[in-house]
Amino acid sequence: MKIITFKCLIVLKLLFIILKVCAEQQEGSSASDPEVQYIADKPGWDRAWTHAALEPLYNTSLYPDVDVFRARVRFPSALGIANQLRKYHLNSTRVKRGTAVVVVRAGTVYGITFEDFSPAFRIRLDSVVSELQRYQDGGYIKLEDTVFILNTRDVPVCTLGYCLAPLFSYIKDIRNGRPYSDDLLVPLMSYPFEKLVDYPLDKKIPQGVMASYMDEAVGTESTCRSLVHRFARADVAGDYIKILDSELLTATSKDSRDRSAAKVAHVSGIVAPPPPPDQLVRYSLVMSCDYQTANPGLASLLHTNSLVLKGRSSWYEYYYRALENGVHFVEFEPGFAEEEVKDALKPGAQAKVRAMVEAAQRFAYKYLSQRSRALFFEKAISEYNKLFGPGYMKATVADLPADRSIQMRDIMALKMYPSSWRQGLA
């Protein structure tokens, strides 16, 4: 009986904490706050809507990823897309359920999956297909015929020479500037952020804030999310760091979002869609901690006029290598989160803080729109095709059936014609 009573007390205490957090958020809700401004067009600021404007991202991310494969000499039998799928993806249920193939033929984009493809990853494949098609139809990009493998999972696949052919992924493992996976990074198209988000500086709450699902796994005691949660609950650090419920942020936001998709992603165990930033921007500092992979919400935080504090991590998205610590954001060691927040709030630091905030917003405004992401994808496909030699991909796509829908068995049966890349000449 005593054990049951003790358990009941614990449950009631947890319920009280959750209700308290929800009440605090609703009290400070910005859903009706007219001073939160979404800015679609910023006079004097540029968008990277040409390949020339995107060269900084190509130089830091795309070209290095492609060069890994350009420098390799492989035996002809080891280079086929079908061989890559057959030898590795079919031998791991976990990898297979997140593996898709994207085909572009005569300007039309197709997504093909295995029969047991996980529904949780469907939004990531569908968003690539639909967004590339939208910008292709709008005349903003011109996609070459191609066939490529897309990894929709939260982790890279091409570790320790795992990939014999380039594989498009959203996440890469990079430590001390050295890649530990060979995935070719491409943009995540499923969570668009197009607008800057501003809030009056003199009305910002002088705290660091992080969005988090209240029932999410925060990892071991030494992880960034776990430590920030612990600081937020502490008597002293709690005055400087606050945790907001991501689900409540989404429910009360002015920004309409697909909440059912967020629920599916959260329940399925993949990183859930990040909440809109219109409540987070009300704080002086916004904090980003990775989950078991890169936090997709970092892009939205960079759009705000709050300083971004990013927990140190080895997970990278396609644009991370173009960001600079101390220029666009402040990187912090999770165990020193409280000290970083205090330092950034000091009066003497505000000139530097404002400069970093503007640099971050300019970066996000210029490089992270959906149109810029679609252009990056177009360039990635072009560079990928070059690896196989002139005309190779066009001939490969021509082998696919034209009188019915393309299926995975058609990809597995592709003829692997010789190419200059296979012969080690590229």
Question: Predicted regions: what is each one?
Answer:
Residues 25-268, 274-275, 400-402, 414-421:
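Secretory-pathway glycan-assembly enzymes, especially type II membrane glycosyltransferases
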Residues 274-402, 406, 410-411, 417, ...:
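Catalytic binding pocket for nucleotide-activated donors in carbohydrate/polymer assembly enzymes
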Residues 5, 144, 202-205, 240, ...:
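Short, well-ordered loop/turn elements at secondary-structure boundaries
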Residues 6, 15, 142, 200, ...:
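A generic structural signal for short, solvent-exposed coil/turn residues
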Residues 14-30:
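N-terminal signal peptide
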Residues 1-12:
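Classical eukaryotic N-terminal signal peptides for Sec-dependent ER targeting/secretion
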